[in-house]
């Protein structure tokens, strides 16, 4: 029990340090070292074990193989955009959004049940809208604004259908001048698409979707 408490306090300290200014050089070096450890595969397992976030199940439990594959493919291009924004790469974000739109345009809606179609249609139109806006955006800051909106609807889509694996719903309180924003991740390790290379570890896991 004592070791678990220490582990939780350690993770909390990392999150606090990551979300504050980087002017304290010696502290930053320690934080960067600990963050790199958290990004490794073995450390991610430890981090997951200490995350105090609710786990939710996808609403639809009997999705067809074709539909599940489509939702997973849309999610993969969402993560493509996310990783590009983490790296401040506007061009690659556009590439991810372009591929997302291609996948959506090729999907056969007749594969969906009536309830599935209602849930899918409600959010996929907004996903398409903001993916298109990311393609047309002139800079990475504008792309991040649209990504925040896209993330809201991608979150609802994955809550409904799942993604074939565990997905983490993250929050950064400092994004957009402390208005805050959310995003989805394939890993418990925080990689912030809104703060980019400036503060990539700022944020926390709010939910886990299975």
Q: For each predicted feature, which ranges?
A:
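Intrinsically disordered, low-complexity terminal tails/loops enriched in metal-binding residues
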Residues: 3-210
């Amino acid at each position: 029990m004592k070791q678990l408490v220490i582990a939780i306090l350690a993770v909390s300290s990392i999150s606090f340090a990551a979300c504050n200014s980087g002017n304290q050089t010696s502290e930053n070096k320690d934080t960067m070292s600990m963050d790199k450890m958290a990004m490794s595969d073995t450390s991610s397992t430890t981090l997951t074990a200490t995350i105090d976030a609710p786990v939710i199940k996808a609403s639809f439990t009997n999705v067809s193989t074709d539909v599940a594959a489509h939702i997973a493919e849309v999610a993969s291009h969402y993560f493509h955009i996310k990783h590009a924004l983490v790296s401040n790469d506007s061009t690659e974000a556009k590439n991810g959004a372009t591929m997302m739109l291609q996948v959506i345009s090729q999907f056969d809606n007749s594969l969906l049940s009536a309830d599935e179609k209602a849930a899918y249609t409600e959010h996929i139109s907004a996903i398409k809208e903001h993916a298109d806006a990311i393609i047309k955006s002139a800079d990475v800051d504008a792309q991040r604004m649209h990504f925040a909106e896209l993330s809201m609807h991608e979150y609802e889509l994955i809550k409904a259908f799942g993604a074939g694996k565990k997905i983490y719903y993250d929050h950064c309180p400092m994004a957009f001048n402390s208005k805050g924003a959310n995003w989805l991740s394939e890993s418990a390790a925080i990689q912030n698409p809104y703060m980019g290379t400036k503060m990539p570890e700022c944020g926390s896991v709010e939910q886990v979707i299975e």
